[in-house]
Amino acid sequence: MSETDTIVKGWHGKLNLVYADRSNSTQLIYNHQQAPLKVQRPFYPEGEKVCHSVILHTAGGVVGGDRLSYNLHLQPNAQALITTAAAGKVYRSDGLQARQTIEIKIDAGACLEWLPQETILFNGAIYRQDLRVELATGANFLGWEITRFGRSARGEKFYQGEWRSHTEIWQQGVPLWIDRQWLPGNDAVFHSPHGLAGQPIVGSLVWLGSPISTEIIEKARNLGNTQGEAGVTSLENGFLCRYRGASTSEVRNWFTSVWQLLRGEFFSRGKCIPRVWQT
């Protein structure tokens, strides 16, 4: 069997969502889904202004040859929070790459909080994720990515396989942040200070669209009181948090605290943890 034949038999999931502001209520006005991707019915735990959505991967995990495609569009003044129902799992590959592509467009006055749960790469996984965000003037984006290399609770290390993560965020044709990461699975890279330094978890949180004061950046740094390595970098009209360590709960707690800080600063919104994170 050729590689092309194998890829065709893999999952080719698609999820296209469009959100619109209707009289100060954000509505999911378009939803096209193709298995194994699915979105739950929208809900509003903090009022009609912010639409909460939960994405499900009904196959339970990703294997080599799978292709997952997301296309998200927030029309002017729409406000949405999107997360996932569970941690993503990328299983050991037989040589084929699994790939996830996310295209996001955020119009003027709109804001997306893109908060997926962590991705777990099994040893031997071959995985690539591409995320591209297009911001209009006056739009805001907050997103994070948390990746665990190997099932470390079982003592597994990422000594085989490959991980690529490409992120681009643009505003009016100007690149605000471009980040390309590549990690081949082997002992040397796992333990190298230029790789994982023996730590199985990395994470990035980025906020872009509105200028950030030095006071907010300093508060975000102070919230990063972790055993793992944590850093905060100022960006043009935003900032970036990075983590490298051994605890999913530690990085999630830090990122959640930063997210809540930004919500209060820019939108005067209170704490609203998605219920699915607590199940």
Curated annotation (Swiss-Prot):
Principal subcellular localisation of the protein: cytoplasm
Places the protein is found: Cytoplasm
Highest taxon above the source species: Bacteria
GO molecular function: nickel cation binding
Keyword entries, A-Z: Chaperone, Cytoplasm, Nickel insertion
The UniProt record lists the keyword Repeat: no
GO CC term, one of those recorded: cytoplasm
Family: Belongs to the UreD family.
PANTHER family in the cross-refs: UREASE ACCESSORY PROTEIN D (PTHR33643:SF1)
Self-association state and partner proteins as the record states: UreD, UreF and UreG form a complex that acts as a GTP-hydrolysis-dependent molecular chaperone, activating the urease apoprotein by helping to assemble the nickel containing metallocenter of UreC. The UreE protein probably delivers the nickel.
Role noted for this protein: Required for maturation of urease via the functional incorporation of the urease nickel metallocenter.
This protein's name: Urease accessory protein UreD
Phylogenetic classification of the source organism: Bacteria, Bacillati, Cyanobacteriota, Cyanophyceae, Nostocales
GN (gene name): ureD
